[in-house]
A protein has these predicted regions:
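C-terminal catalytic domains of large/alpha subunits in multi-subunit enzymes
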Residues: 1-160
């Protein structure tokens, strides 16, 4: 028999979660290499229904955002095929690329969410890019406005 919907829940509003990301980096101006020393995130996703899962979601999104910001890039050859056809060419961050990662939840009760919760999925990948770009700017005096911010881009922008 076909599935039958017996009950649904929708909210008249979709309250946004909030997150701030702060990063401490070590930057070699000669090579352009950026090392993440410490990343601090403060997240307001209402009342997390499953705090352990919310933490894992946040940590994973931060690492993915760091990869997107510093190393993940897709280029194509003359025939339109991706040049990065394996993880040997397409770099993603590993635990060795990370320093300390600290996530703190700022609880707020959201009356329109289930049990006071808000969403958390997409917000976590959004803060590493601006945080890292600002840290690089503070270290070099140069704003980078395209991602990924590669070591070559940093070294070329700081060459005297």
């Amino acid at each position: 028999t076909p599935a039958e919907t017996t009950q649904t829940h929708t909210s008249p509003v979709s309250p946004p979660p909030y997150m701030v990301g702060m990063v401490e980096i070590e930057l070699d101006k000669l090579t352009g290499k950026v090392d993440i020393i410490d990343y601090m995130a403060v997240v307001d996703c209402g009342i997390p229904i499953n705090p352990a899962l919310a933490r894992i979601q946040t940590e994973g999104g931060i690492v993915q955002g760091i990869g997107h910001t510093l190393m993940e890039n897709v280029t194509y050859d003359h025939s339109g095929r991706p040049a990065e056809s394996s993880f040997m060419q397409y770099k993603v961050p590993t635990r060795l690329d990370m320093g300390r990662l600290n996530v703190v939840f700022e609880h707020s009760y959201e009356p329109t969410g289930p049990f006071g919760a808000k969403s958390i999925g997409e917000i976590v990948i959004n803060t590493p890019g601006p945080a890292i770009a600002h840290a690089i700017y503070r270290a070099t005096g140069v704003w980078h406005r395209e991602l990924p911010i590669t070591p070559e881009m940093i070294a070329m922008s700081t060459a005297e």
